[in-house]
């Protein structure tokens, strides 16, 4: 009897997860054992296989690397932590957090609590500033770690999340002189400036917390369900604010996605409108009568791929905007279906037309449109929101897609690999809201 009681206590100390998540693969005819094996295979591709992007450092740290760019980014580090907590991989989670805290997180100064968005794999910073989606994922992953493992196993996860939440509140700072050579980021700012993760007027997430980047946003940074997690379990006294941020993000996504294609721009204004091409002093000006060059960030491209999956996440975890989200899911799948389930490319203008050559964002030294598995993954994940029969074709396409180099040698183990893993987690019912253990 005592043994059974101890087992019951141990079971209670493990996490209970949200019960709503469906196993769409099984619903569409795949066998549960097949799905479990495939999910394990895709996880191992990212963390343990020959093309892995996760690397351990010593006895206690590790990092996720964007291999093709030879760096570690807050994007990948925080994604890795979110994946680790979902899979119950505490050692991986703790290693990634220790590396992030040691090398990326500012421990003092104007940016205290924020994370340098890019570091060399030895920890040397490539940049000091933050990219706001990293903080978004770090906070949420830490809260889930607290909910899953408690705060007495070596890291006080909730305290770490609360520290970041306190540091991202609006504040004034005086910018340090900036090195020359970065005209695309605007002129040097003078005098007191504002820093914040969430724009205090619109309640929308910034592209970057400071500098020119806090004047606009990135639609792929909008994950309303994460704010709901903060409201429930951050215990930082700001629950009403986070609920408001969730609602404002949902309203923003209505504006930022095309009413016919469902596509969105990589970056846009807080009202969902297009970015205007900045013309800083010293940059070439258009000649008289010359049509201004289109700002390529107004196109659907790499960052944008994440939006279908982010909206899917909110649909699954919250359901607060389910009717619109179902319509969105079918709109965007209808568009890609019209392009060919096995043929659609990875960059478009929001109206569905193809970008001109100079608008195509290069990756890995190639300026080329591709049928990328990262986008295949996120469009397939949107099937969770959809009722039409087309969804099965997208799910089957993801299941059968091979993550391997293109004929010209291009291969993205990092971004494509992580989005592929997230999609398999979603469609197998294994990307869930983690509630506190009892």
Segments (PLM) and residue ranges:
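Solenoid-repeat scaffolds in large eukaryotic assemblies
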Residues: 80, 92-93, 154, 161, ...
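Sec-dependent N-terminal signal peptides
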Residues: 4-13
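Aromatic-rich carbohydrate-recognition surfaces in CAZymes
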Residues: 70-77, 124-149
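Short glycine/serine- and small hydrophobic-enriched flexible loop segments
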Residues: 81-88, 137-148, 225-232, 309-316, ...
